[in-house]
């Protein structure tokens, strides 16, 4: 049981951005890149107070002299030392709280290796000494945020995309599908196709510029072939973008060729189904009686669903795949970039949730595997 006076901290550690704040709030207080940067060069000025590592926005702003690394790849933490730095930064610099005074709700991608959540639990209790914690599945939180208990969530972030069917609040594990193709792969793909135009982007810092181009200018075409014809025939789809050094680049069909890869992964040389087929297959793995509810409640969540045109295209593709009489509704909430965090905030402030926390005492008795018993 957790004391009611204490506000929970809600931390959604995405592969690309970390969203953090307090349970009960309607938006995260801190949103910063999940990155750690280390200097590429030797410091020469004494007394400059140069650090051997920078986290988040500070790493982003000094990116020209740093090598940037993301400790979370495809939703799985690959570097625990850096991850601990990000959490430290979250608590002490961004939220300015003592983690040993608040219960902490963390999030993770479905179908993650079990050891991943055990290690998260261990670090929270042993390094940060938190009184209580919980690990929730990201897509389930997004559904909470949309005010539903039944539906299928297509959650696509920077590192991983997954489709999670949920019925009356329970995720159906046998029907969860995961696609290791998301925002970061689209950024890499845009870097590649911009090279064909003669623009060269190679370093980790330049990748961040391309990510910005992607976020500002890309969109999903309703009909890809038709859009390619339009782009070839006129310059109406061209847009320009000013680089940090003042050089202006022009981008045309790349605007929709880049996100097309989540519908056609073969563009990236990846042998897998696009998000529309993955969503459909996920629904078809469920019991025949509940499919109707899933088709009518298909919820998009995550930063890689923010492209203009994605909901219409998704609707069109799933209508093509599904039985002709089926009612299909794609829900794309405007705040879907943060819906995982918002769902976490809602969950952490529910009175019925308070007995779900893993307490320090339970952890001391059972060790890290307690997380599999209490969080599902």
UniProtKB/Swiss-Prot annotation:
Locations listed in the record: Cytoplasm, Cytoskeleton
PTM (free text): Oxidation of Met-45 and Met-48 by MICALs (MICAL1, MICAL2 or MICAL3) to form methionine sulfoxide promotes actin filament depolymerization. MICAL1 and MICAL2 produce the (R)-S-oxide form. The (R)-S-oxide form is reverted by MSRB1 and MSRB2, which promote actin repolymerization.
Keyword DNA damage: no
GO cellular component: cytoplasm; cytoskeleton; glutamatergic synapse; synapse
InterPro entries (UniProt xref): Actin (IPR004000), Actin/actin-like_CS (IPR020902), Actin_CS (IPR004001), ATPase_NBD (IPR043129)
Gene Ontology molecular function: ATP binding
Pfam families tied to this protein: Actin (PF00022)
Residue(s) carrying Methionine (R)-sulfoxide: 45, 48
Record keyword Ligase present: no
This protein's UniProt keywords: ATP-binding, Cytoplasm, Cytoskeleton, Nucleotide-binding, Oxidation
Family statement drawn from the similarity comment of this UniProt entry: Belongs to the actin family.
Subunit structure: Polymerization of globular actin (G-actin) leads to a structural filament (F-actin) in the form of a two-stranded helix. Each actin can bind to 4 others. Interacts with PFN1 and PFDN1.
Misc: In vertebrates 3 main groups of actin isoforms, alpha, beta and gamma have been identified. The alpha actins are found in muscle tissues and are a major constituent of the contractile apparatus. The beta and gamma actins coexist in most cell types as components of the cytoskeleton and as mediators of internal cell motility.
Record function comment: Actins are highly conserved proteins that are involved in various types of cell motility and are ubiquitously expressed in all eukaryotic cells.
Matching PANTHER family: ACTIN
UniProt-recorded name of the protein: Beta-actin-like protein 2
Annotated source species: Mus musculus (Mouse)
Gene (name only): Actbl2
């Amino acid at each position: 049981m957790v004391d009611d006076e204490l506000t929970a901290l809600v931390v959604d550690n995405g592969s690309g951005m970390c969203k953090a704040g307090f349970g009960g709030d309607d938006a995260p207080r801190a949103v910063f890149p999940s990155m750690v940067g280390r200097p590429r060069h030797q410091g020469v000025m004494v007394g400059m107070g140069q650090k051997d590592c920078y986290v988040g926005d500070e790493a982003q702003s000094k990116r020209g002299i740093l090598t940037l690394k993301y400790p979370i790849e495809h939703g799985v933490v690959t570097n625990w030392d850096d991850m601990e730095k990000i959490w430290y930064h979250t608590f002490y610099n961004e939220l300015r709280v003592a983690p040993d005074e608040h219960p902490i709700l963390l999030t993770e991608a479905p179908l993650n290796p079990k050891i991943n959540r055990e290690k998260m639990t261990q670090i929270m209790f042993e390094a940060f000494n938190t009184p209580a914690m919980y690990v929730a599945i990201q897509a389930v939180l997004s559904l909470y945020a949309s005010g539903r208990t039944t539906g299928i969530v297509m959650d696509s972030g920077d590192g991983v995309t997954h489709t999670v069917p949920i019925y009356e609040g329970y995720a159906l594990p046998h029907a969860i599908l995961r696609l290791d193709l998301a925002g970061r792969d689209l950024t890499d793909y845009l870097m590649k196709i911009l090279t064909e135009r003669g623009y060269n982007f190679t370093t980790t810092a330049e990748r961040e510029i391309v990510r910005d181009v992607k976020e500002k200018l890309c969109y999903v075409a309703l009909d890809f072939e038709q859009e390619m014809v339009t782009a070839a025939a006129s310059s109406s789809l061209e847009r320009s973008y000013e680089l940090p050094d003042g050089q202006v680049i022009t981008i045309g069909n790349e605007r929709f060729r880049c996100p097309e890869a989540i519908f056609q992964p073969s563009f990236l040389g990846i042998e897998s189904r696009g998000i529309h087929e993955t969503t459909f297959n996920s629904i078809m793995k469920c019991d025949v009686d509940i499919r109707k509810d899933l088709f009518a409640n298909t919820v998009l969540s995550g930063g890689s669903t923010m492209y203009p045109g994605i909901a219409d295209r998704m609707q069109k593709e799933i209508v093509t795949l599904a039985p002709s009489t089926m009612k299909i509704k794609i829900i794309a909430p405007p705040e879907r970039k943060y819906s995982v965090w918002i769902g976490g905030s809602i969950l952490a402030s529910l009175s019925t949730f308070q007995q779900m926390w893993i307490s320090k005492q339970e952890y001391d008795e059972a060790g890290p595997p307690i997380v599999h018993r209490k969080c599902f």
